[in-house]
């Protein structure tokens, strides 16, 4: 049986507008009472945007910097792209949009796993509590476990132009005390948002047909 979960957030306030943990709560055969939106699963490639924004802020890279997408051993770890093909030098923004693994692992090595992990924890990924060496260079390609709710909440940092606050589920009497924290510069957040919402990115994936002129849309996949 197929499973699914959905989390919808208001990107301005980070308030949860909808959360669906399973296709049917009353379907016991499909474990319908199991809330998959709160379950921890491999992050796949969904954490790459945070790595790229960090690299842009540290001036390790820019969206136009060419990153080598070639077979590269990192000691005993030899990452591959999902299609096992390589594109040679690729601009960082395009490497993010295409979710290429090798450029991302290269960036993580340059940025530093400890610094990357600290950033993810500041974005609300409390499930990533182990030491940097426990994740190694696989952190950006699925080496950690996160929940869909935490992921949706963290992604509000990009339309928020670098500002993030924890997702809120219930209205709080007396006002909202969830402060907004600066995670990225506005420029780094905007660069990531642009890479994930270009027409070519949307058309190539089939998310939107050519000629679409509706509201702006960005997306990132994560295979686990």
Please annotate each region the language model reported.
Residues 1, 6-10, 19-20, 26-36, ...:
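A penicillin-recognizing enzyme superfamily signal
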Residues 2-4, 15, 46-47, 62, ...:
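Extracytoplasmic
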Residues 5-9, 18-21, 66-68, 140-142:
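Soluble periplasmic/extracytoplasmic beta-strand elements of cell-envelope proteins
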Residues 11, 26-28, 56-65, 126-129, ...:
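Secondary-structure transition/capping motifs at alpha-helix termini
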Residues 13-14, 35-67, 95, 151-159, ...:
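Active-site SXXK
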Residues 41, 85-86, 97, 220-224:
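Short Gly/Pro-enriched turn/cap motifs at secondary-structure boundaries
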Residues 61-116, 160, 164, 175-198, ...:
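Conserved catalytic neighborhood of penicillin-recognizing serine enzymes
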Residues 78-81, 112-153:
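Mid-domain, small-residue-enriched loop/turn segments at the edges of structured enzyme/sensor domains
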């Amino acid at each position: 049986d197929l499973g699914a979960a959905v989390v919808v957030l208001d990107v301005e306030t980070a308030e949860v507008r909808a959360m669906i943990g399973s296709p049917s709560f009353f379907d016991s055969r499909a474990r319908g009472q199991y809330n998959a939106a709160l379950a921890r699963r491999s992050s796949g490639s969904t954490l790459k945007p945070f790595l790229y924004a960090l690299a842009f802020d540290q001036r390790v890279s820019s969206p136009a910097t060419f990153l080598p997408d070639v077979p590269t051993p990192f000691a005993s770890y030899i990452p591959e792209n999902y299609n096992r093909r390589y594109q040679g030098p690729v601009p960082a923004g395009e490497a993010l949009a295409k979710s290429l693994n090798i450029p991302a692992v290269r960036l993580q090595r340059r940025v530093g796993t400890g610094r990357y992990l600290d950033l993810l924890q500041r974005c609300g990924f409390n499930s990533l509590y182990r030491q940097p060496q426990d994740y190694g260079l696989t952190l950006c390609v699925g080496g950690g476990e996160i929940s869909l709710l935490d992921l949706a909440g963290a992604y509000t940092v990009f339309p928020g132009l670098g500002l993030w606050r924890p997702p809120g589920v219930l209205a709080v009497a007396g006002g909202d005390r969830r402060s907004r924290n600066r995670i990225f510069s506005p420029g780094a957040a905007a660069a990531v948002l642009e890479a994930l919402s270009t027409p070519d990115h949307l058309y190539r994936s089939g998310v939107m047909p050519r000629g679409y002129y509706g509201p702006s849309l960005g997306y990132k996949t994560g295979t686990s």
